[in-house]
Amino acid sequence: MMSVQLQKQANAAAAAAASRGDGVAIPAASPTQVTDAITQVAESPALQNRAGDSESPYIQAHQDTPVAWQLLDKDAVALAKSQNKLIFMNIGFKACHYCRLTTQESFRNKNVAALLNSSFIPIIVDREERPDIDSIYMNYIQAVNSAGGWPLNVFLTPELEPVFGGTYWPGPGRSTSSAVEDGEEPLDFLGILKKLQKVWTEQEAKCRKEAQDIVLQLREFAAEGTMGVGSTEKALSGAATGTTVNVSTGVPASTLSAETPTKPATSSPLATDLDVDLDQLEEAYANISRTFDRVSGGFNLSPKFPTPPKLSFLLRLAHLPPEVGDIVGGPEEVEKATHMALATLRALRDGGLRDHIGAGFHRYSVTADWSVPHFEKMIADNALLLGVYLDAWLGQAAKEGRTPTLDDEFADVVLELGDYLGNTGSEIGSSSIRQGSLLATSEASDSYQRKSDKHMREGAFYLWTRREFDATVSSTEEGDLTNGKHDGELYARVAAAYWNVKEHGNIPEEQDPNDEFINQNVLRVVKTPAELNTSFGIAVDEVNQILAQAKKKLRARRDIERVRPDVDEKQVVAYNAMAISALARAGAVLRSTGLDKTRGGTWIKSAEQAARDIKAKLFDQETGKLSRHWFRNQKSSTDALAEDYAFLIEALLDLYEATGDESAHLDWAQQLQDKQIGLFYDHVAAPSGQSIDSEAAKTRSGSGGFYSTVEGAPNVILRLKDGMDTSQPSTNAVSASNLFRLALILNNLESSTNGTKTARQYDYDTLARETIKAFEVEMLQYPFLFTGLLISVVSARLGGQATFADVGQGLGVEDASNIIAREFACKPRGGLRALCIKRKDAVSEGVNVGVSGIIGGVEQLKTGEH
């Protein structure tokens, strides 16, 4: 449907963007001859811009553009069908730099808008509001190009089948300083629109046929669970070439084979019939080790993502049962795994991704050494990183058999992230991202540097010239270190050496093709206080004071003079749940150890209030269903997805272990778990008393695991199962873990009571194993892409451990139960374990405080720590 020539031209047009880290999609294959002539279409009734009717800040920001944006609903689809026009779908998010650039260059261009409005039905989608839609078309883009990114621009038939797609295309007249190999001029956004208009007018039948064929293949891969793993690359565009990194996942395309194994025809879903075994953890570790950057930390080259699931997997290897360590290669290999994770966390802590003046981490780096970030801050990323840094901090103390201290490495990052997410009253707590008790989705990459500026710039809030930096740090105030000992200029030089601030800026020229970062500096730590002591002859303690005061001055100037990046005010269930989990775990450590009871209590209260508000605002008591997000004092009309349930259940289990409140947290977690199963689970057999009709069978594969969307969801052409970890843990990895944890907790609570049983609609343990089995064929070939599910393989094979504590007078009292609770809180995550709070009707002689109940897997857990 698209010529090879157009493929090359579209890719060349986006080459400049790709050099900054945004993926570029190759249009669908199947060559046809395309000319430059533009076919005039019959006039249709003028469309009206409906962006203002949206519940998304990203979409609402487009209500003043000349493009007549439609929302993804039955009316827009019906319009495309009645007028027989291609749908142009833009998928983006508010914090994204290239999404804003596309809007500025193309969607505000009158010629682009005129062609979109007359020849297409333009539909705009917020990927954070509808990640299910984004996932479908991102899979298509990745299938034909092995890379993706945002904005995601796709042309669809009126039946929503993809015809052509890409990411960022330069606006009309914007120079790309790039050309294709055979000398063809690169196409800009307007040129691509003209080509698509021409092709649809002259070759509609062929476009439809090939789009239908592609959807059929994608549907087959989705049914097999192989979507996104590699088979689509072969089927739709041939084997992948090069080392393209997918900016939506951080996965290098070159690591994916073009062959995918066939599922055994006789595969059985029985709980004990798992083909995937502990050996896959060794294979995953070996692959991750091969991609580790031993110079700069992280994995692969660039762009580089923090990838919390991968870091968590590496850290967990040291805290899994010894059987796992033996399979991985023994203590030496486990130590290497820990080293890779810690080296990466140090690089993140010191590098350009961290906001050294405020708090939090940016989304990813466009350079291998973490020096130049894309500046958007995502709440989900920071919540997940808090959990990983917490495990890294606790792991050092656990290795030495002691309680953690605030002097241990990474404690400072844990405190910073915890306050950023859960303590707006702190010096660095960000009130801008907290809307009431819930967190907004993100802070944007672009902003105005000064209130009088007319144009936004990428990273404007975070960048410093050497002149401005020196003037700020060298300024003197009463009580300032600069009053007395040394002059302010020396202190500015010390701080500049620490953060690598240079006269002509520290951003490489190749990362600034449009001269936007001339003389600008990204702060990153390149010297230790000890090295500064040697260079400047200033005591280490005084160096630390200088840096602390410099940070305080820079933050004050930034807050007063600069304009904070826009905040996406959506409060998404899944992202808030990630923060609840991390705050509950981190707060429990600070409170139970006494390291900072006030701060720990604040974090836990923040997490509990967020959970209460989700229940009050976004949970329907009658139906038991969640809504996806809260925005401007009302819940969205978009139903929650499987990931919202998964992460919220996990958060409630973490809150239960932090507080011991069974009625508030454990009971609701079980209620949500049953609802998630009812809405999203692909039952291997019909649940008791139910039957699956022939129509329903068309959207189910009967292989276990959770679909991302409910059955019959409108405008969803594929039901996908999310099993592969990306920058976030997969829905099915989190869900399998939740099912095992619930089974462990409830089984042990029931065994401790005098005949009291908790009513259960489902066998959680069996469903967890079925969920693993749903992905085991892919896990056998690509285990490194399924690190989250691999941890549940350990649970399935070796079981888990439940530790009992008695709330007694409350978890704040120092008694035997609180010692147990403290020891539990201070253990980094490893395998399956749970803290069970004794019920009032527990049989005292049957369960003692601190005695662990064990549930077994295929092999019983005998020794080792979970």
Language-model segments: residues:
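Replace the tail clause
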Residues: 1-578, 582, 630, 688-698, ...
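Short coil/turn linking the two alpha-helices of tandem helical-hairpin repeats
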Residues: 318-325, 393, 397-400, 587-594, ...
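Alpha-helical positions within canonical tetratricopeptide repeat
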Residues: 336, 340, 406-409, 413, ...
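C-terminal capping/lid segments that line or modulate ligand- or cofactor-binding pockets
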Residues: 455, 463, 637-662, 714, ...
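Phosphate-binding active sites in nucleotide-utilizing proteins
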Residues: 568-617
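Extended, leucine-rich alpha-helical cores of fungal transcription factors
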Residues: 569-576, 580, 585, 600, ...
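Long hydrophobic segments that form regular secondary structure
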Residues: 575-584, 734-752, 759-764
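Acidic, turn-prone loop/beta-hairpin segments
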Residues: 680-731
